[in-house]
Every structure is written in structure tokens, then in C-alpha cells.
Swiss-Prot record:
One GO cellular component term noted in the UniProt record for this chain: peroxisomal membrane
Gene3D superfamilies: 1.20.80.10
Name used for this protein in its record: Autophagy-related protein 37
Family: Belongs to the ATG37 family.
Transmembrane parts of this sequence: 244-264
Stretches assigned to the ACB domain: 5-103
Amino acid sequence: MADSVDRVFVHALNTVKKIPKTGASRPPPTDRLRLYGLYKQAMEGDVDGVMERPTAASGLASDELQREKDKWDAWNLQKGLSRTESKRRYIEALIDTMHRYATTPDAEELVSELEFVWNQIKDNSPSSSLSSPRPNQSTGAGAQQPQQEPEQASDGEGPLKELRPMSEYDEAELRSQRQVDLEDDEVDVPTSDRSSGRWQRKVERALTTMSAEVAALREQIMTGREWRTKKERSVPAWVKWFAWLLVKHIFADLVILSVVLLWLRKRKDQRLEDIVRAGVRLMREYVRNVLPSRG
């Protein structure tokens, strides 16, 4: 189910881009920092090894330095979460935040569509305890890590846990991590070979990202069709359709009646015109009797 979570995560990021800049209430800094931390954890993993906590030695202004520290702390609060679990929490936090602060009709429709997509898969997606194990970054034989991790889990925690198969996205990450470990171990490899391996890893990551975006776009198109079908089958949609159909028929009847009256008047035949005048006279009398008099 990690692929489904990835698709909804991309859908959530697109939803954030589509939120109107005017009219909607801005969430408080605590909510924005929590979303930022979950986003960075989902995209890059733990903050350790990626960047250090900003200090005064970085040369930033006091206000900007405090903002960078808050961002780093928000990211560090999500330490230890897998990428799939971070994406799940980001989606749920975004839906909750938009329900509280998205007050415009466009924003409400965006969060309703995102929640509709998320409800379809969240009950079937595994929790973080059942997600695929993250590759260990310690030095050593990287190719033997997938076989060693189930044994460590069984020795350290007693009962065996159910491990689901890794998704294509996780397998691509594992292959990239293996290449990084092999590059670190093989010191005697020529520079040209290491450059080609680094280039190959970048290409694989780009292909993986492109595949996820294409799958997310396909999911978004299918979801949009389902959403439109659901709205078209609602009671207000049926009422609007019936009212529009009635107006079209009345307009068409009036046009046909006008053409027939003109044709008969040209032939000096006033029978139909007399019938129409009598009908209009009866309608006026009925309206005069129903509506209260002005006096």
C-alpha cells in the first residue's frame, strides 16, 4: 500500500499548491511547522546527517536564525518515523488543518476531494510497524542487510512480526543505498567509475520520482472523474438539470408558437390568436384573484 500512500501524498502536495492565497485563514506557526517537519521527514528521512542545527556562527539575522531553528526542531521531532508513516501523518495533518482554516468554497472543495481520496486507502494501508524496514546506513556489507534485519527483529522483540513485501519505490531506495555503501567501501575504484555510478543513481531516482508523479496524475484523473460523477448524481444536480430542461422546453414552445401565430396572421386566420388571447386573459384573472390587491 506504500504506492497508494505515495500517490495520495503527491495529491496532497498539489492540493497545497492550489489553495487560494486570498480569503482563507492562515494556520498558526505550530501547525505550519508540524506540516513542514512531516514533509521533510517524508522526503529526506531523519535530519541527522542531512543538516546541523543552525547556530549564530552561520551569520544569519536573529529573526531568520530563530525561524531556521524552529524548522530544524520541527523536523527533528519526527525523527525515527519511516517515510511512508510520515506521509500518512502529513496527509492526515493537512486534512485536519484545512478543515479548521480553509473557509473559502474552493479550499473546502479541495479538502473534500483530498479526504475522499484518502478515505479510500487509509483503512487498507499498513501502519508504520508493518512498513518495510529502512536500510541501515552503518558501514559494512550493504548487500546482506535485507537478510539480517528480520533476524534482528525476531531476536530483539520476541514474536515474529509480519513483514510486507517492499514496494517498487522502497526497492529503488534500497538499490540506491546499496550503491552508496559500495562506493564508500571500494576506495580503490577509479574516479570515472564512481562518477558513472553516481550519475546512474541520479537517473534511477529521477525515474522513480517520474513514475510516482505519473501514477499520482493517473490517480488524480480517475479521482476527478469519480468526484464529478458523484456530484452529478446528487439531488441538487438533478433539480438543476430538471429546471434547465423545463426552461429549454418552455422557450422552444414559445418560439414555435410565435412562428405559428405570425404565419396564421399572414394568412388572416385569427383562430389560434383568439385562443392565445383567451388563455392570457384567464391567466391574468387567476393571478389577480390569487395575489393580494395593492389597495
